[in-house]
Curated annotation (Swiss-Prot):
Record bears the keyword GTP-binding: no
InterPro entries: Ribosome-inact_prot_sf (IPR036041), Ribosome_inactivat_1/2 (IPR017989), Ribosome_inactivat_prot (IPR001574), Ribosome_inactivat_prot_CS (IPR017988), Ribosome_inactivat_prot_sub1 (IPR016138), Ribosome_inactivat_prot_sub2 (IPR016139)
Active site (UniProt): 207
Record's function text: Potent catalytic inactivator of eukaryotic protein synthesis. It may be a component of natural defense mechanisms involved in protecting the kernel against soil-borne fungal infections.
Protein name: Ribosome-inactivating protein
The protein's assembly and partners: Synthesized and stored in the kernel as a 34 kDa inactive precursor. During germination, this neutral precursor is converted into a basic, active form by limited proteolysis, which removes 25 AA of net charge -6 from the center of the polypeptide chain. Additional processing also occurs at the N- and C-termini of the polypeptide. A two-chain active RIP (comprised of 16.5 and 8.5 kDa fragments that remain tightly associated) is produced from this processing event.
PROSITE patterns the record matches: SHIGA_RICIN (PS00275)
Keywords for the protein's UniProt record, in alphabetical order: Cleavage on pair of basic residues, Hydrolase, Plant defense, Protein synthesis inhibitor, Toxin, Zymogen
């Protein structure tokens, strides 16, 4: 994800601005009678109300990206014992942060960065790019599902300080199949468990909204005891959502265009892109938030 540089006037406006979400969608995570697919469909329906149609593009196009986000929505993920609220930008579907039951907002970033959330948020201490969350691993290594979402919500809801959640939970997690990997990761990075929980939510919620393929894959295995993962190809496509969106605009003007980097992703034309991607990022304005190149999104979350 490209870096965003805010002007002093933008900083002042954001500091004094309280976020008012356009809608809040509640997902009862442990309710087996409420399918993941219904949750994603409901959120998409509300997001589409703020999208536009673009001639030659099959999918709805998100609002133009802004340096200081103007449009937000919340998703409240509720388990039997706890809940967290995710703050998501409408213009690019990025997860910016989450709120605990105690009313504390945790935001991606660190000291010296500029807050986008109101209500005195705290920094998580790391960014929201996939490079920040999983390093050089592929997204096919991220295990998802109803049980994974439940654990993520319950653990993140207890977050009080920047690096203590991992220290408190790692012993309990030693009984999990990936315990050895978690223990090794926690030893190298005290934030490893928080990052692991967040990347699961980013893929299940944000990428589930962006991608038909992701939402279908997650839905098919959401109730599986062993969880569900993306394919290698799906993971690579997810990390190129911005570029796929740009290609959708190119195909709108030149329907028969051959776009080599799309072919590498298994996307030969706009029909194939529409099968894979549900919502397209707006490319019509040179928003400062987008920066120099759409190809910088290799590890955006």
């Amino acid at each position: 994800m490209a870096e965003i540089t805010l002007e002093p006037s933008d900083l002042m406006a954001q500091t004094n601005k309280r976020i008012v979400p356009k809608f809040t969608e509640i997902f009862p995570v442990e309710d087996a009678n409420y399918p993941y697919s219904a949750f994603i469909a409901s959120v998409r329906k509300d997001v589409i109300k703020h999208c536009t149609d673009h001639k030659g593009i099959f999918q709805p196009v998100l609002p133009p990206e802004k340096k200081v986000p103007e449009l937000w929505f919340y998703t409240e993920l509720k388990t039997r014992t706890s809940s967290i609220t995710l703050a998501i930008r409408m213009d690019n579907l990025y997860l910016v942060g989450f709120r605990t039951p105690g009313g504390v907002w945790w935001e991606f970033g660190k000291d010296g960065d500029t807050h986008l959330l109101g209500d005195n948020p705290r920094w998580l201490g790391f960014g929201g790019r996939y490079q920040d969350l999983i390093g050089n691993k592929g997204l096919e290594t991220v295990t998802m599902g109803r049980a994974e979402m439940t654990r993520a919500v319950n653990d993140l809801a207890k977050k009080k300080k920047m690096a203590t959640l991992e220290e408190e939970e790692v012993k309990m997690q030693m009984q999990m199949p990936e315990a050895a990997d978690l223990a090794a990761a926690a030893a190298a990075d005290p934030q490893a468990d928080t990052k692991s929980k967040l990347v699961k939510l980013v893929v299940m919620v944000c990428e589930g909204l962006r991608f038909n393929t992701v939402s279908r894959t997650v839905d098919a295995g959401f109730n599986s005891q062993h969880g569900v993962t993306l394919t290698v190809t799906q993971g690579k496509q997810v990390q190129k959502w911005d570029r796929i969106s740009k290609a959708a605009f190119e195909w709108a003007d030149h329907p028969t265009a051959v776009i080599p980097d799309m072919q590498k992703l298994g996307i030969k034309d706009k029909n194939e892109a529409a099968r894979i991607v549900a919502l397209v990022k707006n490319q019509t304005t040179a928003a400062a938030a987008t920066a120099a190149s759409a190809d910088n999104d290799d590890d955006e979350a």
